[in-house]
Amino acid sequence: MSGLASLVPMVIEQSSRGERAFDIFSRLLRERIIFINGEINDDVSALVCAQLLSLESDNPDKEISLYINSPGGVVTSGFAIYDTMQYVSCPVSTVCMGFAASMGSFLLMAGTPGRRIALPNATILLHQPLGGFQGQASDIQRHAERIGKTKQRMAELYAQHCGRSYEEVERTLDRDHFMTAREAQTWGIVDHVFDTRKKAA
């Protein structure tokens, strides 16, 4: 989102106190809508986690909508968002528009059960975590062990949220696995495929 800063439109609101201008994302945040658009990294993670916690503070029971169009990114950054989604008391609906890959698909399936949505032309990609390391052989071995544990934990959580066996998830994550919106629904990544907001209401 930061790369589009110069393209973000402003919304003008009139009130008894005068005229106020908001960027479109701040305006949508007032409606409890959060966007993840692009790569997931520490900056995006900090922003999304802060928005989730702020909205929970405003109203701990009202739904938050998280819209995702992301190729994935840093695993630890994604886990920070995942844990915060589970931590807050608000239900969190997730909506895939465009593409949810890797950590993007992981966050998509982490929404509140019954509130995980894909738009009809969305594409979802699952695969195992990626990593590359340099250094001493002993350090490379430790990194390899760590990424193996991360892969195992991700498979456990996919199985938990999607209603699949651990073994099936592990096989699916072994290679790039693309899904249509309907295939993602069948697999348990999302609960619904909606083409209009009226159907989601």
Swiss-Prot record:
**Record's keyword annotation contains Nucleotidyltransferase:** no
Catalytic residues as annotated in Swiss-Prot or TrEMBL: 102, 127
Write down the EC number.
3.4.21.92
Recorded GO cellular component terms are: cytoplasm; endopeptidase Clp complex
Indicate the principal place this protein occupies in or around the cell.
cytoplasm
EC class (word): hydrolase
Q: GO molecular function terms here?
A: ATP-dependent peptidase activity; ATPase binding; serine-type endopeptidase activity
Q: Where in the cell is it found?
A: Cytoplasm
Biological process terms from the Gene Ontology for this record are:
protein quality control for misfolded or incompletely synthesized proteins
User: Which Pfam family would be a valid example here?
Assistant: CLP_protease
Name the reaction it catalyses.
Hydrolysis of proteins to small peptides in the presence of ATP and magnesium. alpha-casein is the usual test substrate. In the absence of ATP, only oligopeptides shorter than five residues are hydrolyzed (such as succinyl-Leu-Tyr-|-NHMec, and Leu-Tyr-Leu-|-Tyr-Trp, in which cleavage of the -Tyr-|-Leu- and -Tyr-|-Trp bonds also occurs)
NCBIfam families given in the database record: PRK00277.1, PRK12553.1
Family to which this protein belongs: Belongs to the peptidase S14 family.
How is the subunit organization of this protein annotated in UniProt? Answer: Fourteen ClpP subunits assemble into 2 heptameric rings which stack back to back to give a disk-like structure with a central cavity, resembling the structure of eukaryotic proteasomes.
Protein name, UniProt field: ATP-dependent Clp protease proteolytic subunit 1
Organism of derivation: Mesorhizobium japonicum (strain LMG 29417 / CECT 9101 / MAFF 303099) (Mesorhizobium loti (strain MAFF 303099))
